[in-house]
Amino acid sequence: MKKNIIIALLAVLIGGFVQSQEVKWQSIENASKTENTTKLYFIDFYTNWCGWCKRMDRETFSDSTVATILNKYYIPIKFNAEGASQFEWNSHTFTKGISVNGRPATHTFVTYVLGNKIGYPSFAIFNPEKRLLQVIPGYVKADEFAQILWY
């Protein structure tokens, strides 16, 4: 009997560790309407063609520690840098950029946040008042990313 209880407890504990946490991504349109929050905003700037963006999804954002931190302390936002959404952020209206030479247009919000240092993936952290605090460029491994998110 005692052995069965120990086995059952181990199964529950191991199952809890194996179960992965997923980031609860929001759209920029929904997040931009958020008011009276104490959480920071975290924005993942990506494109559909970006291999390193897909690797971040697969390896970094799927990490349970990273996902837990993002869900608990941030409003996590996925933003397609070549998308066509229109929204207001911190009293500014942003729209799809203008396509040049048939290339996909970079959204005006990307230019506003990243300036002339546009690259993917890139990440931005804003305070609850939607003012930019930090930009993080490029691929980052899960353990390093968790440390960045704590600070």
Task: Map each language-model feature to its residues.
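Bacterial Sec-dependent N-terminal signal peptides
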Residues: 1-22
